[in-house]
Swiss-Prot record:
Origin organism lineage: Bacteria, Pseudomonadati, Pseudomonadota, Alphaproteobacteria, Rickettsiales
Location relative to the cell: Cytoplasm
NCBIfam families reported for this sequence: PRK12325.1 (NF008979)
Annotated organism of origin: Neorickettsia sennetsu (strain ATCC VR-367 / Miyayama) (Ehrlichia sennetsu)
Coiled-coil ranges from the UniProt annotation: none
Enzyme Commission code(s) on record: 6.1.1.15
Name by which UniProt lists this protein: Proline--tRNA ligase
Database matches in Pfam families: HGTP_anticodon, tRNA-synt_2b
Length: 436
């Protein structure tokens, strides 16, 4: 299906100004560029442009996880309270957990996470060690009743999450699964145009003996300081190139990264002293992974038959990426004073076609017909408005058709990232964008 539209036909409600209470750049641009519309405190409707980006992020995540042998499923938003009572976690979330009853007086909740549900599912289906290991994931909307939702999509009450859960026979096997997800996260974030920093962190209410947060660095909009060695970026790039099927190489590299000094501010108990090899930056958390063993399988009696015929508890891990939050983080990193600059991998449209002269309409239509992933500004607005619109919504490339375009057969190509401009023929453009 062709991904192309005209501005005159598209639902693209842009805003010139936003409330003075809007502080983060991602919050401002998600509203101004017509990605979302706020419906209430911490609640947003996703408009066509924003939904396209959200789906493109999902696609990158699915490609990486599927390539690693993980299996997608879908669990419900609404969960039974009795499952959380089984795990002993029902009271841990406090007022952030939205609780209610149905007409039959059954206690329910709007799930903020899915450890209990997935454990209840597999305890009925995975009966033998021969069926392990398994990693299952889903992408679903979650709800946490934040006392003070703020910063737009960065801390909304309703949010889209990718959750994955691993089931293994023992700790050694579980570490292999953990390392596999660890690498897949680095690959995902790199494909999204980000530089991830995996940091040791607190496990919180999820629990577990081993966990890492994945942060991206930013000059604005950070949640707190992170500390990491200056060689971290090179090591992450090297790790992403390792064949995921090479379990030994993946494990060795994971251990190497985890031995480095990478901490969030709250976990930096040892201090960094005067070591100038340690970098300090503002970080935004975009993912969190946990290895928690039998924390849920033991109280919920989720067991399998081991090689010796004895019943054993699953050794489990949990792995999350906040997808809607990730979109906001990408805007924080990839934007300027004119608007968003989407990485090509997730842009809603790769090309913004701008016709500057009425006499060039026929030529512009010909260009539009031969390209894909394009939004064509066919309105009668001024040149300044058209350029500002394309800069704001962040399409990576702008094709500009002037008065002399049809005469000389040349078209101006502008790169949103650095505003570089160059002249191209239509055939050159078709060839260029058929390979991107």
């Amino acid at each position: 299906m062709k991904n192309k539209t005209r501005v005159s036909e598209y639902y693209l409600p842009l805003m010139k100004n936003v409330s003075g209470e809007v502080k983060l750049r991602s919050h401002k641009y998600s509203l101004r560029a017509g990605l979302v519309k706020q419906c209430g405190a911490g609640l947003y409707s996703w408009l066509p442009l924003g939904l396209k980006v959200l789906r493109n992020i999902e696609s990158v995540i699915r490609q990486e996880l599927d390539s690693m042998g993980m299996h997608e499923m879908l669990m419900p938003c609404i969960q039974l309270a009795k499952l959380w009572e089984e795990s002993g976690r029902y009271s841990d979330y406090g007022k952030e957990l939205l609780k209610f009853k149905d007409r039959h007086d059954n206690e329910l909740l709007f799930g903020p996470t899915n450890e209990e549900v997935i454990t209840a599912i597999v305890r009925d289906d995975l009966a033998s060690y021969k069926q392990l290991p398994k990693i299952l994931y889903h992408i679903q909307w979650k709800f946490r009743d934040e006392i003070r939702p703020r910063f737009g999509l960065m801390r909304a009450r309703e949010f889209l999450m990718k959750d994955a859960y691993s089931f293994d026979v023992d700790q050694q096997s579980a570490r292999i699964s953990y390392n596999k997800v660890y690498q897949s996260y680095l690959r995902i974030f790199k494909r999204l145009g980000l530089n991830p920093i995996p940091c040791r962190a607190n496990a919180g209410v999820i629990g577990g003996s081993l966990n890492h947060e994945f942060h991206i660095t930013t000059t604005e909009g950070g949640e707190g300081k992170i500390f990491y060695p200056e060689e971290m970026g090179e090591l992450v790039d090297e790790f992403c190139k390792i064949d995921p099927s090479n379990e030994h190489a993946v494990s060795v590299m994971t251990e190497k990264l985890q031995e480095l000094f990478c901490f969030t501010e709250e976990c930096n108990s040892s201090g960094i002293g005067n070591d100038n090899r340690i970098c300090t930056a503002q970080g935004i958390e975009v993912g969190h992974i946990f290895l928690f063993g039998e924390k849920y399988s033991a109280p919920m009696q989720a067991r399998f038959s081991g090689r010796d015929g004895k019943k054993k508890n699953f050794y489990m891990g949990s792995y999350g990426i906040g997808i809607s939050r990730l979109l906001a983080a990408i805007i924080e990193v990839h934007s300027d004073d004119k608007g968003i600059i989407w990485p090509e991998s997730i842009a809603p449209f790769k090309i913004g076609l701008i016709n500057l002269h009425g006499e060039s309409c026929g030529f512009a239509e010909e260009i539009f017909s031969k390209l894909d992933s394009v939004i064509y500004d066919d309105t009668a607005d001024s040149q300044g408005v058209k350029f500002a619109r394309m800069d704001l919504i962040g399409v990576p490339f702008q094709i500009i058709v002037g008065k002399n375009g049809p005469i000389h057969g040349t078209i101006e190509l502008k790169y949103r990232l650095d505003s570089k401009r160059e002249s191209r023929s239509l055939n050159e453009l078709v060839s260029l964008f058929s390979h991107t």
